[in-house]
Structures are given as structure tokens and as C-alpha cells.
Amino acid sequence: GNEPAHDSSREDHRERVLGWLRELAESGETGKGFPSEYGGEDAVDRSVVSFETLAFGDLSLLVKVGVQFGLFGGAILHLGSERHHEEYLPRLIRAELLGCFAMTETGHGSNVQEVGTTATYDPETQEFVIHTPGEQCRKDYIGNAARDGHMAAVFCQLITGDSDETRGVHCVLVPIRDEQGNPMPGVEISDCGAKLGLDGVDNGRLTFDQVRVPRENLLDRYAQVAEDGTYTSSIENPTKRFFTMLGTLVQGRVSVCGAAINATKVAQVVAVRHGLERRQFGPPGADEEATLMTYRTHQRRLLPDLAKTYALHFAQEGLVRDLHAVFNDDDGDDRRRRELETLAAGLKAIATWHATHTIQQCREACGGAGYLRGNRFAALKADTDVFTTFEGDNTVLLQLVAKGMLTGYRGEFEELNTLGIAAFVAANVVERFVE
């Protein structure tokens, strides 16, 4: 573009956001979702609610916090084993170790199963060799990468044994900067440059050229590689293993959903207050003009969306309760987890699309005043726009919801005899007819 990749205002914004993140880490607010033995509070629900609250302020801080504690920290917590927790979580929670979540590539976003970055095991040195085989396989749009991150949780195709056959996508911890902040040997880091919004987040690209990391850096909760390269996993089916691993990261989707709802509330507060104060037209002979909110056209412009925000708010509260229950369930009920993933996917899509639509409606309802930066619509529009894309493209997420519902129906039908199926269909037909 015409804008330089590094301008002073963006650098200042990034520096401020990093300072705020460190302050939050010192306060203990950002560690609530982690185990108490590592400095957390074992409170997934309070963690999500704290995160959502940041949407009332600078959304760059919200996203930066999400990358550091939700994505990078969440990958280590949910995909790593106890030794990873002991080594990394305390420093991560205190923001002494800043990290990235390197999943998306230039050529693959939604289709994570086909990412191109490779991690090839070398039994002679007991190391994984991390490599970017082409430009489409570089890690792209990665938060914390361009400036501040020192380690990346890299999702890559794991290759073990004599063949080039992949074991599927796994996550490996890769140091990307040394203590002085310089890129590690074989790691190329670049800045994504100017974005539509979220200027306080340092999104960057990562390319790996035969970068070696110890065998222990594989996050091995679900799959292990022995010293001789033998691969083992408690989940034999590679597709099921992949979706189980991704399913543990559902908290990010739930968090973005809540953040979108809260950002929408900010826009609606401004617009409704403006509508109650601003006067325009009125009956002939009246002493003063009527407020905008007196007019049904203005009410219809704002109030149905406001009602929907209330509905989404309460739906989100229920989703957070479900998330907390599922992640504190020692039995690990697969069905409950699948239902949670379906709910989170659907609500995230609905809430973020609602945010994009409603913030624009609120801006228009404030007239020229809505176009002034001081009234926050510029930042709200620019910073929330990508919410419909990250943590899952909304259209793809709705397809995930459809798949989840069909799977659920199939499960119910399998448990029914012919009479039961007839009763089930009849009940649903009656229900739809009544609606």
C-alpha cells in the first residue's frame, strides 16, 4: 500500500499495548484460566469474562492478550504435558515469555489439516527439523510475531521414520528470537504491515529454514515420539486425533464471541444516548424539536439490534458456563465437548456478524458526529471487522454447525427403533409447524 510498513504512531501504539499487557499480567487478571499450581486460579469462566471486559477499551489490547494467554498459553496448557506446563506456564502467565500461535499460513487458513510447514524427526540428534517448503507455507498474520514474541507454538505436519508420510498436524514449540530480540538462526521474521485496524497488534510472518528444536518441544499430550523416532498416540484415528487437538482450543472461539458482543454494546450505548439527546424536527408550534428516539424510524433502526444484543449476551453467559463445566469434567464426555464446539461455532458467527452490522447502523444513527474518531466508531469498525474471519471464518463455522447437528441427529436415530423414529419426526414436524 501507500502507507509505510513502520510508522511512529503504530510503533507507539504497539509499545503502549505491550505495556498494558505486562500490567495486566502483574495484576493476575490474565492468569485466571490456568492451573493454580502454576500461578492461575483454575477458573476458565472467570478468565473468559475478564477477557471479554477488555472489549470496552482498546481492542488491540484484547487481541494481544488473547494471543499471549488464550492461544499461545492455551496451546501449551491443552496440547502439552506436565513438563511443558512446569517449564513454560509460570513465565508465560507473568508475561516474561511472550509467544505466538503459528497456525495460519499464507496458503492455508480454514483448512488447517493441509498446512505445509513440516517437522521432521532426526533420531541421530533427537531433534525436530522445522521447515517452510515454500512461500505458501509461511506462517502468516501471526499476532506477537512481528515485534514481541520470543517463542511460537507452530502447527506443522509431523514426519517420523523412514518414509515421508506425515503423521498429521501437531504442535511444536519453536524459539523465534534470542534474549536480545534478534531472530534465531534459520528463522525469518517480517511485519505484515498496515492493516485495516488493530494497529497495536504486531502481526507478522514466520519462515523456517531447517530450524532444529529438541524432541521435548513437541507438545505431546495426544501423541508422543520416542528417542528412536517411534510414534505412538492414544487416539489411533488421525482425523479424530486432529479434531480432538483442535477441540481443546475452543476457548478462543468462545472468547471472541463475548468480545464481539461487548464491542457492540459500546456502539449501542453511544448511539442510544445520542438518540435520546439529539433533537430534530417536531410538531408545528412546539417549543422545541423532538428527540430522535421519539421517531419510530429511529427506534426501529436501533432497538431490534439492541434486543438481539441482549439475547446474545445471555446466550454467551450460557456458553461460558458450558465451557467451564466441560473443561472441569474429569470424565471428558465426548458428546458434551462436541455440543460445546457446535454451539461456540454458531454463536461466534452470529455474534461477530451482528457486531459488524450493528456498529455500522449505530454509526449512521449518529450522523456526522458518528464519523468523528472521538465517538469511537472508527476504531470499533476497523478493529472488529476481522472478528468475522479469525478464530474461524463465519461461513465455514456455520457449515461446522450443520455438520454437528446432522451428527447429533444420526446419533439420536441410531438409538431409536422404527416407532421411535416416527415419533421423533412427528414431534419435530409439529414443533416446526407451531413456530
Give a label for each model feature.
Residues 142-144, 207-252, 272-293:
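A glycine-rich, basic-preceded beta-loop-alpha segment at the flavin cofactor/substrate interface
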Residues 184-210:
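Flexible, small-/acidic-enriched active-site or ligand-binding loops
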Residues 341-434:
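Alpha-helix capping/hinge segments and adjacent helical runs
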Residues 2-6, 31-36, 53-57, 69-74, ...:
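Glycine- and acidic
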